Amino acid sequence: QMYFDLLKFPYPSEQKGVIERLVSENLISDHFDGTFTIANIGAILLAKNLNDFPTIKRKAARVIVYKGESKLETVSDLQGEKGYAVGFIGLVKYVMDKLPQNEIIEDAIRKSIKLVPEVVIRELLANALRL
């Protein structure tokens, strides 16, 4: 269902339609005996939990935040568990929350201004996760 939600496709009313679509996109392989194999690309993109796939769980996204410019002290180290497509929005949000920001007061209201636009982070992460 995640595949259809992410691409904003209507979810097929029958299981056969779901399987046909996933096979046509090479996300699963049909063995024609009622069994299917999830392709690595399907798992790494759409897994709700990459730990369910031992051969690719080490490919999970990982974000390390260092204190200052040295790599000796880490502030946080987070290893993702979701597939790239499923967890992408959360990954962007997490990185944006870790970036430095300035505060300004405008009309008696305090506002936080990010030093790096979200579109830049989104593109950077998309390129870093390129398969």
PLM regions: where:
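Active-site helix-to-loop segments that bind/position phosphate- or nucleotide-bearing substrates
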Residues: Q1-L131
